[in-house]
């Protein structure tokens, strides 16, 4: 029987700060199979970067809570980089995408070898 390929996908995501109106940037990898564990793991790597001016894509709902308040996913450009209003935040998102690209290459190379 042929073993299924493990296509680990790495993506940049946002997590809302509990106390401020800012979002933490992190890189998430899934599925990651680790030794000693039967199920695939979701690996998160926080980048110690925050952004305050993401542009929200009003056509893509993330979730709607019990009160009916809707949250949205961030708007991304053609390369998948999160778009921001301020230049400094945009540079943080570009940095996060570079880290994502590096991690994706690491997972792809580990699959080959």
How should these model regions be labeled?
Residues 1-112:
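Basic/aromatic DNA-contact patch characteristic of tyrosine site-specific recombinases
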């Amino acid at each position: 029987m042929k073993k299924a390929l493990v296509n680990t996908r790495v993506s940049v995501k946002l997590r809302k700060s509990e106390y401020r109106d800012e979002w933490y940037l992190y890189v998430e990898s899934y599925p990651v199979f680790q030794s000693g564990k039967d199920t695939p793991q979701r690996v998160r790597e926080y980048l110690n970067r925050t952004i305050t001016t993401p542009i929200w894509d009003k056509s893509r709902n993330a979730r709607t809570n019990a009160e009916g308040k809707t949250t949205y996913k961030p708007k991304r450009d053609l390369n998948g980089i999160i778009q921001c209003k301020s230049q400094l935040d945009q540079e943080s998102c570009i940095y996060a995408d570079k880290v994502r690209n590096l991690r994706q290459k690491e997972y792809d190379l580990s699959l080959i070898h």
